[in-house]
Regions:
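Basic, Lys/Arg-enriched alpha-helical interface segments
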Residues: 1-63, 72-75, 85-121
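Conserved catalytic cores of phosphodiester-cleaving nucleases, focusing on short active-site segments
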Residues: 66, 77-81
Length: 121
């Protein structure tokens, strides 16, 4: 099973969610660790395919989101966990999209530094 690597403040932010939200999103991350996809996980638009996923949960009128990538062989990288505050529909706010892009780059850098060269395992 792949480990979860938390980028930036995503772990602290995730742990601030209500327990029922943590449970549901935690299960989605567990499925990603085992190579499966939660039924509520959807590719995040703007990232070119199914490598960056978003899971959304509502709790007592508030909306919570976790964004993670399954692009890398060695880990599931949780890129961002946040409570959506914007009332402008379902679209992810631009400042959150920018943070996700920065953290995806950090995950890519981490992957490059820690990947096992092919044929050396």
């Amino acid at each position: 099973m792949k480990p979860v690597a938390w980028i930036g403040s995503s772990y602290k932010d995730f742990r601030s969610f209500p327990d029922p939200v943590q449970d549901g999103m935690g299960y989605a991350l567990f499925l990603a660790q085992t190579g499966k996809m939660h039924g509520d996980a959807k590719p995040l638009k703007g990232f070119g395919g199914a490598g960056v996923l978003e899971v959304v949960d509502d709790n007592q009128g508030d909306t919570y989101r976790a964004v993670y990538t399954v692009k890398f062989e060695e880990a599931v990288y949780d890129l961002h966990a946040f409570q959506k505050k914007s009332k402008q529909g379902r679209k992810t706010p631009p400042q959150d999209m920018e943070m996700i892009r920065r953290r995806l780059k950090a995950a890519e850098d981490h992957h490059r530094q820690h990947q096992t060269p092919r044929g050396s395992a």
